[in-house]
Amino acid sequence: MSGKGGKAGSAAKASQSRSAKAGLTFPVGRVHRLLRKGNYAQRIGSGAPVYMTAVLEYLAAEILELAGNAARDNKKTRIIPRHLQLAIRNDDELNKLLGNVTIAQGGVLPNIHANLLPKKSAKATKASQEL
């Protein structure tokens, strides 16, 4: 007999979020809701929020990794806005992407113009040539 009933005693499969199905940490459902509520388009496909969530997660991981390296270079264990600024501005692609972004409490990149550096004296150059 073919019917709707399955085997007796078999447990129903637990529901799995779209984030878990895609192997992501960021919430796909929330991104989908924000895309729908934002009036970006009349209709939003099912793959669009998954792809966008994956891109956002990748960018966040990339920035956090570089900021963590900057914090470690400064012998700190906590990432502060200064570390985010250094990480973004020292990376060519992230700097191009976030070129117009101002990071509060980020400071500026250390840079001294070559004309402002002290000139080598004649004595220092002669002494180095003799050795």
Swiss-Prot record:
Native organism: Eremothecium gossypii (strain ATCC 10895 / CBS 109.51 / FGSC 9923 / NRRL Y-1056) (Yeast)
Modification sites for Phosphoserine: 128
Glycyl lysine isopeptide (Lys-Gly) (interchain with G-Cter in SUMO) crosslink residues: 126
Matching InterPro entries: Histone-fold, Histone_H2A, Histone_H2A/H2B/H3, Histone_H2A_C, Histone_H2A_CS
Disulfide pattern: none
Record site: Not ubiquitinated: 119
Record's function text: Core component of nucleosome which plays a central role in DNA double strand break (DSB) repair. Nucleosomes wrap and compact DNA into chromatin, limiting DNA accessibility to the cellular machineries which require DNA as a template. Histones thereby play a central role in transcription regulation, DNA repair, DNA replication and chromosomal stability. DNA accessibility is regulated via a complex set of post-translational modifications of histones, also called histone code, and nucleosome remodeling.
Subunit note: The nucleosome is a histone octamer containing two molecules each of H2A, H2B, H3 and H4 assembled in one H3-H4 heterotetramer and two H2A-H2B heterodimers. The octamer wraps approximately 147 bp of DNA.
Entry-annotated residues carrying N6-acetyllysine: 4, 7
Note in the entry: In contrast to vertebrates and insects, its C-terminus is not monoubiquitinated.
Modified residues annotated as N5-methylglutamine in this record: 105
N-acetylserine: residues carrying this PTM: 2
MF annotations from Gene Ontology: DNA binding; protein heterodimerization activity; structural constituent of chromatin
Pfam families for the chain: Histone (PF00125), Histone_H2A_C (PF16211)
Biological-process GO terms, alphabetical: DNA repair; heterochromatin formation
Gene from which this protein is expressed: HTA1
Record family assignment: Belongs to the histone H2A family.
Keywords assigned by UniProt, alphabetized: Acetylation, Chromosome, DNA damage, DNA repair, DNA-binding, Isopeptide bond, Methylation, Nucleosome core, Nucleus, Phosphoprotein, Ubl conjugation
Domain notes: The [ST]-Q motif constitutes a recognition sequence for kinases from the PI3/PI4-kinase family.
Subcellular location(s) per record: Nucleus; Chromosome
Motif ([ST]-Q motif): 128-129
Protein name (record): Histone H2A.1
Description of post-translational modifications: Phosphorylated to form H2AS128ph (gamma-H2A) in response to DNA double-strand breaks (DSBs) generated by exogenous genotoxic agents and by stalled replication forks. Phosphorylation is dependent on the DNA damage checkpoint kinases MEC1/ATR and TEL1/ATM, spreads on either side of a detected DSB site and may mark the surrounding chromatin for recruitment of proteins required for DNA damage signaling and repair. Sumoylation on Lys-126 may lead to transcriptional repression.
GO CC entries: nucleosome; nucleus
